[in-house]
Amino acid sequence: MTERRSVLFRGATVVYSYYGRRGAPAVVLIPGFLETRAAFVPLAEQWASRYRVVLVDVLGHGESGCTGYVHTIEDQADAVLAVLRAERIRFFKVAGHSMGGYIALALMERVPDRLRGVMLLNTHPFADSEERRALRRRAMEIAKKEKSSYLHAAIPALVAPENADRLREELRVMAEAARTMPVQGILAAQEGMMLRPDRSGLLRTVQSFPVVVVAGVDDPVIPLEVTKAYWNFPAITERRALTGGHLSFLEAGGSELGW
């Protein structure tokens, strides 16, 4: 069973999909920057046989609205918590891809007693470097002037070059979904990522739940060496390096992901 649902959060509508059966253990799946629920349907359907999966469009992305000109990672985490309140879900696992991983870490900081597992997909816990902030500012200027050109360059770059042809349809779907996003949503997310703090301390101590890290061997956005800088921290219980780029969970050809 799949249902489209929504909840009001700070005056904006947050849209999400609900998979599986009520009463099963809950998993929240959070897409990343420029991503929508559309790209994660195969993963949600894979998990729906064991879990009830809540697949969320983050603020300013997909069908979810904007609450302001800056969406901090903490704002995004609060929006996810609003969805969980609406579904009356107290205990859950969370899987976040890229920016969604930053949101998952914020949830790990905010509600650790409610978590039953964390999966960090092609992401990291560190704050932006000055170099990274400069790159974001340049990207924001391009997005302001010509959103279509910005997306045309950004979406295909998510996968390893050798996978681009095989995943052409998936990338087309992602690009079409991204074109519907308001520029405000793109800029607000970039601003929020620049403001996020270092949360690596959360992973330096053992947690009461499993923490799984999934990386792409050829990830152009978050290189494998960045992931390796933290994946031996005490909280990490499992490490997986998949073939592919930033969408490694998709590029690896249906590799089973789970806790």
Protein language model features and the residues they cover:
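Alpha/beta-hydrolase fold catalytic core
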Residues: M1-V28, A48-R52, I89-R90, T180, ...
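Conserved HGGG/HGGXW glycine-rich cap/lid loop of the alpha/beta-hydrolase fold
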Residues: A12-Y69, I73, V83
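Alpha/beta-hydrolase
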Residues: I30, V58, L121, A241-L242
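A short beta-to-alpha transition loop/helix N-cap that caps and shapes the active-site region
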Residues: E63, L105, T123-E131, E162, ...
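Conserved hydrolase catalytic core segment
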Residues: I89-S129
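Conserved alpha/beta-hydrolase catalytic His-Asp/Glu region
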Residues: D128-A134, K145-V206
